[in-house]
Curated annotation (Swiss-Prot):
S-adenosyl-L-methionine binds at residues 76, 81, 128-129, 147. It holds the Pfam family GidB. This is Ribosomal RNA small subunit methyltransferase G. Specifically methylates the N7 position of a guanine in 16S rRNA. Its main location: cytoplasm. The lineage of its organism: Bacteria, Bacillati, Cyanobacteriota, Cyanophyceae, Synechococcales. It is found in: Cytoplasm. Keywords: Cytoplasm, Methyltransferase, rRNA processing, S-adenosyl-L-methionine, Transferase. It comes from Prochlorococcus marinus (strain AS9601). GO terms for cellular component: cytosol.
Amino acid sequence: MKKQNIPEEILSLITEEEINLFQELQIKIKELNNKTNLTRLTDGDDYWVSQVFDSIWPFKAFTNINFDNKKFLDIGSGCGFPGLAYAITHPNSEIYLIDSLKKKTDAIKILVEQINFKNNIHVINDRVENLAHQSSMRNNFNIATTRAVSNPSTVSEYILPMLKKEGFGVLYCGKWTNQESKNLDKTLEILEGKVKDKKEILLPRNKGTRNIILIQSKNFCPEIYPRKVGKPEKNPL
């Protein structure tokens, strides 16, 4: 397949085989989009920068941390990003993709069936507020992330209960302020977590600024979290 329209910043991060899988994924998402409105980010830089690059660069940026061969959770996976992107670039990891909308998880299941992923991939239609109180899911993941779901403090309440001790949460943010940093520190203190690292990047092709906040579980999160559906969003810790 042609790759002249793929930004060089992406080509430097992934292999030829991975490029082919991302192109195949793009085709399948477009086909599903004709039946189900999954995402508007399917063409050109919208796909290659806002979906692919944005999903994978955090796992390349923190070079002191091994993200391979892990149990990975994507909360609110939507059309499969960043979870399926991580799956392509980390084929030895086990992947869990959860979303509360059945049309989204049905579509992701089709993508998983049609594309030759090497991973063991699980797709679950439920809310993290429910799953986090199930023993088979809680404290069960090395890495958990979510993209475009809510503010960092709310997202941390979703992520920390799912992590194993010393597991990592990857928070995708736009601009990052001192007040947001203070709010997050306060929340993490309650949830038995800490900020491990932070990186900022200007996305290729003028797609804006992206901050990644890497959080880590210090101890198991108190069992009362996350709170019932709606409360983390309406009343952040």
